[in-house]
Amino acid sequence: MAIEPLTIKIPEEKIEDLRSRLKNTKLAPDFNNLDWRYGTNREYLESFIQSWIDYDWSETENEINSFANYTTTIENLPIHFIYERGEGTNPMPLILSHGWPWTFWDYEKVIRPLTNPSAFGGNANDAFDIIVPSLPGFGFSTPLTTDGVQAVMTTDIWHRLMSEELGYERYAVGGGDFGAMIAQQLGQRHPEHVIGVYLTMASGARRSPEQKPDSVPPSTLETLLPLINGPTSRLNKEDFAPEETDWYERLETRWASALSHVAVHTNDPQTLAYALHDSPVGLAAWLLERRRNWSDNNGNIEEAFSRKFLMDLVSIYWLTDSFFTSARWYWHTFRTKIEPPKNPTLAKEIPLGIAVSPKDLVYTPKKMVEENANLIHWTEHPRGGHFGPAEEPELFIEDIRKFFRKLR
């Protein structure tokens, strides 16, 4: 199907329905939870609800529409994407993939500086053509009515988008969270077309020789992000270099904050979906807790994200009715077998760049990456968490330019 321009326009009755539900919310009691130990704090949520009632979606809609949005159909799936051309005569095509609980809007602050660097104090020679798609079943890549859609299938859809729909013979890839998995899989499955892979989450490791059953936490579940050519597995403290010991300690504590949603999303997401599809406040509580737990914010979520951005995030999920299909995509992704690359030699030669943030969820020892991939760029950021381009856009912009500058 041909690519068509897309103007985002949510019907006013849907906005009014959201406000009505917010005004008639019945909140559960909450006590002794100032530190969010039991989940989203009620006092913060009440304040957020009031802001959301007064929130002007049309402002965000106009901001989204200020970018060039398009839609197409690939594998009978609706695919939304932003496509902004870079300045100069030879911008590098770069597709950026998001994860969960992200949306395409997590890249909003980095798109224009990457496409038009000279307007932001940069060098026009660093320009990119930027493509930011919404994952199938997320945001405006809806409605999703096909079962079985997952990350590996998405990888091949992205390749078709870049090569067949947009006409790029070779292109660069980047991503975080599930977007990192997709970016890495593009390099594994289509290495002849990939210029380089840039990740803001490095996960995946070889199984330790003396694997202990209680050597938790996992660097990933079995199917998530095979960054290293080999089976992913749990990491032991001994796998980390002395200067990386605190990474393992962070891994132990921070991965625990992900287990609750992973358990539900990978077992019975539809049961949760009935609640969150009906209650915008329930949806907000579910998403906000993860954003707080996985970002660098000193216990205050709004040190990492503005309240408006958080309302944008939850509104995109709510107004597109996409929580349930995003969770279904999650379920299938964790049950997808990762196939070995058809050309392992070429796949291993793909240049790899990794940015490590101090408050991310998962970490991989640098030596494991160096031994098993063509690592040419490694950055350890001084701040930031799991949502790099949204939390620290300037660090993201500077670092991704540095990596791909080596490949121009």
Segments from the language model and where they lie:
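Glycine-rich "HGGG/HGxG" loop immediately N-terminal to the catalytic nucleophile
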Residues: S58-E59, F120-G122, I131, L135-V149, ...
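Non-catalytic accessory segments flanking enzyme active sites
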Residues: K14-G86, N90, F309, W318, ...
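Alpha/beta-hydrolase active-site loop
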Residues: T146-E165
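C-terminal subdomain of alpha/beta-hydrolase-fold enzymes, centered on the catalytic histidine
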Residues: H265-R408
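Short beta-strand element of the alpha/beta-hydrolase
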Residues: P91-G99
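The serine-hydrolase catalytic nucleophile loop
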Residues: W100-L114
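A fold-wide structural signal in alpha/beta-hydrolase
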Residues: P93, A127-V132
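Conserved hydrolase catalytic core segment
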Residues: P113-F120, E165-T223, L235, F240
